[in-house]
Curated annotation (Swiss-Prot):
This is Acetyl-coenzyme A carboxylase carboxyl transferase subunit beta, chloroplastic. Acetyl-CoA carboxylase is a heterohexamer composed of biotin carboxyl carrier protein, biotin carboxylase and 2 subunits each of ACCase subunit alpha and ACCase plastid-coded subunit beta (accD). The keyword Zinc-finger applies. SUPFAM superfamilies: ClpP/crotonase. Belongs to the AccD/PCCB family. Keywords: ATP-binding, Chloroplast, Fatty acid biosynthesis, Fatty acid metabolism, Lipid biosynthesis, Lipid metabolism, Metal-binding, Nucleotide-binding, Plastid, Transferase, Zinc, Zinc-finger. The gene is accD. NCBIfam families: accD. Pathway: Lipid metabolism; malonyl-CoA biosynthesis; malonyl-CoA from acetyl-CoA: step 1/1. The keyword DNA damage does not apply.
Amino acid sequence: MEKSWFNLMFSKGELEYRSGLNKAMDSIENEKTTISKDRFIYDMDKNFYGWGERSSYYNNVDLLVSSKDIRNFISDDTFFVRDSNKNSYSIYFDIKKKKFEINNDLSDLEFFFYSYSYCSSSYLNNRSKSDNDPHYDPYIKDTKYNCNNHINSCIDSYFRSHICIDSHFLSDSNNSNESYIYNFICSESGKIRESKNYKIRTNRNRNNLMSSKDFDITKNYNQLWIQCDNCYGLMYKKVEMNVCEECGHYLKMTSSERIELSIDPGTWNPMDEDMVSTDPIKFHSGEEPYKNRIDSAQKTTGLTDAVQTGIGQLNGIPTALGVMDFKFMGGSMGSVVGEKITRLIEYATNQCLPLILVCSSGGARMQEGSLSLMQMAKISSVLCNYQSSKKLFYISILTSPTTGGVTASFGMLGDIIIAEPYAYIAFAGKRVIEQTLKKAVPEGSQAAESLLRKGLLDAIVPRNPLKGVVSELFQLHAFFPLNKNEIK
């Protein structure tokens, strides 16, 4: 049997194939193809995933000299691949004997691979569109994107027709013959372990296969990923400081995440955690009672209301901190939010502590009527005493979104007003303005960058240096870290 070697890139996520062999595999003729030296493909930077019991994931080839030749490439029985750890393997298909083998002893092939890898890479770099390539397909542009799509399609067609790796092997058949393949099982750690006696069988019972929990395995990991609001890309939920790795968009942070970002570990002491709303005006809408919405938000966020307040150390400097949480009913300001912030400011006044309020709110909470509006005046009053009478230092940090009554009260009363990049800051939202005034709101006019140019903000600071910037501002206003004797 003639063998041809070439290099593929594999990574999780592009094409999904459920391992299994066609019941009628004996009828498939064996294909033989040779590959000319000037049409080899190499580039193994990506991960390689072995065939598992249920599914395997293969990525497309990165680049070809001629897209048309992929049908010849994938028709061969042996594939030469390399994983992200630079380990080389050969994947061997024997259609006639129904074998599937992976060999990781390729020392004799290394020189062969590297010699042609260098030649082909040079050829790819020097080749221009004006060359008369006899293998050029006029319907496929010589771009990485189109080439990948074409190769994906070819690989998909080959495996579907020759190994029947889709719904074909799930269907019932009168043929009771069971197909077996020997497999190398890839462990979770990514290391390949040999299992000579391990077999994968095509099952004729569709219900047994479809009832497997493996088909719903992704449901168990929904909480691990988050989607960017701007580019819609998926990323690990614990991405550093909730900043999109692709486009740099700032994602929303919970109040607990912001406290962890700002306060030194082990120094946070929360205040008034047991304060909850009692539906003071017995608000009830046709959709859902206010009390039910409060209960639902508490279960979802683990908070009692839309703000966390407390005392902690920021780079060793004792600080009074209040952080609003947009996930709790849009960060709306009700009587509990107003009372907790008021008590925090009063405590900071008595203890002569610097104050930070991190704003993220849709405004006053309509379910509490005039009681929520009253919080604006109450907070502004205690802030006046804190700033004017005691001459203490208050930093307001505006995040996206900060709107309504929060913007009209303590959000814009800081001695220093800092905003995050691209933060949406306004009193009335764009839709409300356009429907009320019947005028279009210019794009970006309510963004932090626009407000900075108009003098409404003092600075726009990214999340990474924010803690250091605030610490320096505190020291400029004579708030210094505690010495070792004062730290308990």
